Amino acid sequence: MIRIDAVTKRYPDGTVAVDRLSLEIPDRAITVLVGPSGCGKTTTLRMINRMVEPTEGSILLDGQDIRQQPVNTLRRSMGYVIQNAGLFPHRTILDNIATVPRLLGRSRRQARERAAELMERVGLDTALAKRYPYQLSGGQQQRVGVARALAADPPVLLMDEPFSAVDPVVRKQLQDELLRIQEELGKTIVFVTHDIDEAIKLGTRVAVLRTGGRLAQYAPPAELLSAPADAFVEDFLGADRGIRRLSFFPSAGLELQTAPLVPADADAGTLAARATAAPYLLVTDPDGRPLGWSEPGRLTAGAVDRERLLDYGRPFVPGTDSLRAALDGAVLSPTGWAVAVDGEGRAVGVVSQQVIGEAIRAAHGRVAERAGEAAGR
């Protein structure tokens, strides 16, 4: 556990970057520091590995004050990932990742074997091993940065806005990859971001900081969304925090209806049989994966003009995705139906906005009931 105890960072000109901050950061979890510019997020992160020394207070790692350890020893127990990867431009990808193992005395062969293993773990093709950083995309460079930070198998990983410089699609991929890696490795991660959606998605606990480095609230994401501590936190979370909260309600209980499916290569008899089943038919490929919605009369036997199909929105996986994902799929679909798929992307049913709304009301009711029981104890 990392314990930050009444830590203040005051610079010689009188600027206070962090003001009496106290946090307990649990082991094997992702703790996110989030807040507006100037709230001391990065300063706090840098104090954990002594890139910046606190003016007052103390930081303990597993019960020991970090100032009692040599700086180099402390930093070798912590991986560090920054916004723009910070790769060595003159080294290959493999040797960038192998840097820390080599510094720790491993042979060149051992370090490179470890680097190759980590390339696979972070989703990088080992065919990229001999390339240089400038030959990689921004997302690939960030994966290299994560791999390098993990190379010495540190128990602690510090991440300073690592995904903010990439586009939204790549950012989501990197976030998902981090969650997968964390599930496998169980590191103690301190993650800095200014993006509240990223904080809610990744964080086991989220610390919201005010300008001037003061703690506004420290709580699990679901609690943060349901009970913001004050007007500042509520405003920072944004007007759509109710929608975000749906991310913590499972979709497993949704009652699916049989999807009115028709294969893209259906013959005239099949089309005729399905034509009266529903006002819209969900056209699928030969493997049962959805392609789009169509009115029955617009389909021609033996062939489907895919450009004329209506978008089916974003599918969701029951039991894996949340009610937010299901609602998103229904809202995006012109039919008002969300398409449910299995793990292979095959359509397994549909659910209406009305049914999703009923599930949301039931979920809120259960939360309120549990809150009432807790208050009565």
Walk through the language-model features, giving the residues of each.
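Hydrophobic anchor residue at the start of the ABC signature
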Residues: 146
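Helix-to-loop junction immediately C-terminal to a conserved catalytic motif
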Residues: 49
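Conserved signature/switch motifs of ABC ATPase nucleotide-binding domains
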Residues: 134, 152
